[in-house]
Amino acid sequence: MKYRGFGRTGWMVSEIGFGGWQIGGAWGPVDDDVSVYTLLHAFERGINFVDTAQLYGAGHSEKIIGRALREWNGDKIYVATKAQPTVWPNASDNAPAFRGRFPDWHLRENVENSLRHLGVERLDLFQLHTWAPNGHLELDWLETLNDLRREGKIDQIGVSLRDNRPGEGVDLAHLGLVSSQQVIFNLFEQQPRDALFGAAKASDTAIIARVPLDS
């Protein structure tokens, strides 16, 4: 397995990560024991980065990952999870309002739920599950997340960009307000190369590629 630095966090993460959407049961029943076995096999093969979200099976994916972490006796596994907004922005809206989608009470509730599901004392990477081009101008969400960092409940902060809208993360990357951005990038979706990747490199913001094998 090859590893690379995860932005400015100091982490060395596997170039291949484990996506936790399917083990949440989004596409039908799954065998939880098989899911745990699969995770442990991935860890044994050198994968040390797992991405999940509370949305994935209403927290079920997080719980399965938590089981695997308790059974794992090897090196550090970094787990990234996400909080969905109180209201999802309209996919066709080019400039959705961002303030109020991640209020303080909502973020704190999500952090506590993820801590409980994963069975950990601190979340490695806590991400917003959507974004908007004006999000860097409405920083109520960041104030709360920085408070949670100071409280020791989360380590790093990230965002997951909306589908096929990598340009919405460029200003955020230039400012370096978060440690990572998650974006669709594969053979068919190359837009992040236009501006986002350069901005992220300049601020040492890590990039997580979504659906890299999309077909």
What are these regions (language model features)?
Residues W21-D33, S92-R108, T130-N134:
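Active-site mouth loops of central-metabolism enzymes
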Residues P29-A42, R101-L118, R162-L172:
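Short, acidic/polar
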Residues L115-N134:
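Active-site groove signature of glycoside hydrolases
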Residues T130-S215:
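Beta/alpha (TIM)-barrel catalytic core signal, keyed to glycine-rich beta->alpha loops juxtaposed to Asp/Glu
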Residues M1-I77:
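N-terminal binding-site loop/beta-alpha segment at the start of enzyme catalytic domains
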Residues V13-G17, N48-F49, K76-A80, R122-Q127, ...:
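Structural preference for beta-strand elements that scaffold enzyme active sites
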Residues G7-G10, E44, R67-Y78, L115-G119, ...:
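Acidic (Asp/Glu)-rich catalytic clusters
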Residues M12, Q22, A26, P89-P96, ...:
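Glycine-rich, positively charged active-site loop/lid region within alpha/beta enzyme cores that binds
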